[in-house]
Curated annotation (Swiss-Prot):
Subunit organization: Part of the Ragulator complex.
A Gene Ontology term for the protein's cellular component: Ragulator complex
Transmembrane segments: none
Family: Belongs to the GAMAD family.
Function: Regulator of the TOR pathway, a signaling cascade that promotes cell growth in response to growth factors, energy levels, and amino acids. May activate the TOR signaling cascade in response to amino acids.
Gene from which the chain derives: lmtr-2
Name the record gives this protein: Ragulator complex protein LAMTOR2 homolog
One example of a Gene Ontology biological process annotation: positive regulation of TOR signaling
A GO term, aspect molecular function: molecular adaptor activity
InterPro entries the record matches: LAMTOR2-like, Roadblock/LAMTOR2_dom
């Protein structure tokens, strides 16, 4: 079972070295957990809905989309698929090394894959 407190703790572990936000949400944009800085112009649930919308648009064009990096004027957002049904995103500032952002994203996704699969198996 995936507990909310444990999920928040795990998401918070990647928020170092320029990474200042991490989200876990479904493909429709429904936010399950967010950990990040308090200085944000857009609410985390709105951000997850926007990222999910961008993902859906990209997924229509690419048949087997697994990851995307969005380069923004104030940083980057990396997003990847977890357990076929969930999206994991991390936001980093401009100074963050893109390779480190991707490494954190992939490591966190791999760590969350099995717990999320077991939950979806229990529900389905």
């Amino acid at each position: 079972m995936l507990k909310q407190k444990a999920l928040v703790d795990v998401l918070g572990q990647v928020n170092t070295s320029g990474v200042d936000g991490s989200w876990l949400f479904n493909k429709e944009g429904l936010l399950l957990a967010y950990v990040g800085s308090e200085q944000k112009a857009v609410a985390s649930n709105v951000s997850s809905a926007l990222i999910a919308s961008v993902w859906a648009a990209l997924e229509r064009r690419a048949n087997d989309l697994k990851e995307t990096i969005l380069v923004l004027e104030n940083g980057v957002i990396g997003c990847t698929l977890v357990a076929r049904t969930m999206l994991l995103a991390v936001k980093a500032d401009k100074s963050a090394d893109l390779g480190m952002v991707r490494a954190k994203l992939h490591t966190l996704a791999a760590y969350l894959e099995q717990p999320i699969l077991s939950i979806s198996h229990d529900l389905g």
